[in-house]
């Protein structure tokens, strides 16, 4: 308010030769706002507005009191609020454009399962509050489990709850390039300080692929400084990595210590149910009219190698098939034709016996944990035997490997396989079920 009072005095000197102008139109001005380096002032009188807006010297007067001022606009009350709303909207769009986020990654299309529930809950907490209780949050897990999706969803949801928040999503390699670019500026020190100032002004910093930072000493030095500054100001940082902090190669122990100073959470592999749901979400996003049978969806999920990116590729292939053949239904028969390469790759190296076991348990409606336990209930023994049979006869696993999964000895597995072989001789329907379960 003191600055604005001083600004009015400068206007008084500017218009001291215009009789009564200051006393009548300027002296009692009170309502103003400074937005995006533009000073807006409410002036009720149209003559006064036109007079003031046509004076090119006024922005120079304002610049004596306000840093980086680029314009002064005298407006009526209605235009005042319209301009502010427009500037607010523009400011939010500018903030989002500079965030590095993609609107495709949200919590709405993020599938939550047992393997990622804890990191999801931590992410929601970060996005919905201005607290930094978990700073830094360090998320790690194998590639293809949805870590990038989660990281960007945190940023997008933060904007939903706090539209004026300063958020930045950056891949570690891009951050390293920013540091290199800053060093190659004419004024190297100014370039580095400008980079640090930009990052240190953030409310939420999201860094992807943290494991790539290894051997980039200068980059880590800059990151170390930014990290300390943000944490000291109570701001939130989230790191994502394929490895735990202790497994990161060639990284300064001080930085490793910082990574471990907050909340450390792991994203686990998806179960079959989650993979099926993820595939359903991706198909719906690509074309709501695509239909896929439960059996086909389960097989497509199983050959994904527990990789969300692979699932997206599978969904894209299914979309291509639907668009080119005009057939909206994906079933067991055309699935193997569409995903021929994926099935071949799966049989060579990607087979996950636990996904097969989960699929069998779903078919017989029994819990996976019970089948993997010591429980000897007849219905569980039967399902366990079927799993043993499929793993041995259809996927050629060694008896010892199968026994390790079910915590059974060699002879027990052999007996289970023989029991199912005899049951198949008497019951053709069991053979049909087993055939449908084999990928």
Swiss-Prot record:
Query: Which InterPro entries would you find in this protein's record?
Result: AAA+_ATPase, Chromosome_initiator_DnaA, Chromosome_initiator_DnaA-like, Chromosome_initiator_DnaA_CS, DnaA_C, DnaA_dom, DnaA_N_dom, KH_dom-like_a/b
UniProt keyword terms in alphabetical order: ATP-binding, Cytoplasm, DNA replication, DNA-binding, Lipid-binding, Nucleotide-binding
Against Pfam families, the record matches this protein to: Bac_DnaA, Bac_DnaA_C, DnaA_N
Region annotated Domain III, AAA+ region sits at 100-322
Task: Please list the GO biological process terms of this entry.
Answer: DNA replication initiation; regulation of DNA replication
For the region Domain I, interacts with DnaA modulators, give the residue spans: 1-72
Entry's Gene3D superfamilies?
A: 1.10.1750.10, 3.30.300.20, P-loop containing nucleotide triphosphate hydrolases
Segments of this protein annotated with the region Domain IV, binds dsDNA: 323-439
One example GO MF annotation: lipid binding
Provide one Gene Ontology cellular component. Answer: plasma membrane
Positions with a binding annotation for ATP: 144, 146-148
Q: Where in the cell is it found?
A: Cytoplasm
ATP-binding as UniProt keyword: yes
Q: What is its main location?
A: cytoplasm
- Region of interest called Domain II, as start-end residue ranges on this chain: 72-99
Function of this protein? Plays an essential role in the initiation and regulation of chromosomal replication. ATP-DnaA binds to the origin of replication (oriC) to initiate formation of the DNA replication initiation complex once per cell cycle. Binds the DnaA box (a 9 base pair repeat at the origin) and separates the double-stranded (ds)DNA. Forms a right-handed helical filament on oriC DNA; dsDNA binds to the exterior of the filament while single-stranded (ss)DNA is stabiized in the filament's interior.
Q: Which family does it belong to?
A: Belongs to the DnaA family.
Report quaternary structure and partners: Oligomerizes as a right-handed, spiral filament on DNA at oriC.
The identity of this protein, by name, is Chromosomal replication initiator protein DnaA
Q: What is the lineage of its organism?
A: Bacteria, Bacillati, Mycoplasmatota, Mycoplasmoidales, Mycoplasmoidaceae
């Amino acid at each position: 308010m003191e600055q604005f009072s001083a600004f009015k005095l400068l206007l008084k000197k500017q218009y001291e030769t215009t009789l009564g102008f200051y006393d009548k139109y300027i002296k009692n001005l009170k309502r103003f706002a400074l937005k995006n380096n533009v000073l807006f002032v409410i002036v009720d009188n149209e003559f006064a507005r036109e007079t003031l807006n046509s004076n090119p010297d006024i922005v120079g007067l304002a610049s004596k009191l306000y840093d980086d001022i680029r314009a002064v606009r005298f407006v009526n009350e209605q235009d005042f609020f319209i301009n502010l709303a427009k500037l607010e909207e523009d400011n939010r769009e500018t903030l989002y454009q500079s965030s590095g986020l993609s609107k495709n990654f949200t919590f709405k299309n993020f599938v939550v399962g047992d393997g990622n529930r804890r990191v999801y809950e931590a992410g929601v907490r970060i996005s919905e509050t201005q607290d930094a209780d978990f700073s830094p949050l360090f998320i790690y897990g194998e590639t293809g489990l949805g870590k990038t999706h989660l990281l960007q969803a945190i940023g997008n949801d933060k904007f939903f709850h706090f539209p004026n928040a300063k958020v930045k999503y950056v891949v570690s390699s891009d951050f390293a390039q920013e540091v290199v670019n800053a060093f190659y500026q004419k004024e190297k020190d100014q370039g580095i300080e400008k980079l640090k100032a930009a990052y240190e002004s953030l409310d939420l910093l999201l860094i992807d692929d943290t494991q790539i930072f290894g051997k980039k000493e200068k980059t880590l030095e800059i990151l170390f400084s930014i990290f300390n500054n943000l944490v000291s100001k109570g701001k939130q940082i989230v790191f994502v990595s394929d490895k735990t902090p202790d497994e990161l190669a060639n990284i300064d122990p001080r930085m490793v210590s910082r990574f471990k100073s907050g909340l450390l959470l792991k994203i686990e592999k998806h179960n079959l149910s989650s993979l099926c749901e993820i595939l359903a979400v991706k198909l719906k996003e690509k074309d709501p009219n695509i239909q896929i049978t439960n059996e086909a969806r389960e097989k497509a999920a199983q050959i994904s190698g527990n990789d969300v990116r692979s699932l997206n590729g599978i969904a894209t292939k299914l979309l291509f098939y639907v668009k080119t053949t005009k057939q909206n239904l994906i079933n067991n028969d055309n699935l193997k034709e569409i995903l021929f390469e994926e099935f071949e790759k799966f049989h060579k190296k990607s087979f996950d016996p636990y996904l097969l076991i989960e699929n069998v348990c779903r078919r017989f409606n029994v819990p996976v944990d019970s089948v993997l336990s010591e429980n000897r209930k007849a219905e569980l023994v039967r399902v366990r035997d079927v799993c043993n049979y499929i793993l041995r006869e259809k996927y050629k696993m060694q008896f010892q490997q199968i026994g390790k999964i079910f915590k059974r000895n060699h002879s027990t597995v052999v007996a289970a396989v023989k029991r199912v072989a005899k049951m198949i001789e008497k019951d053709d329907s069991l053979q049909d079920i087993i055939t449908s379960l084999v990928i």
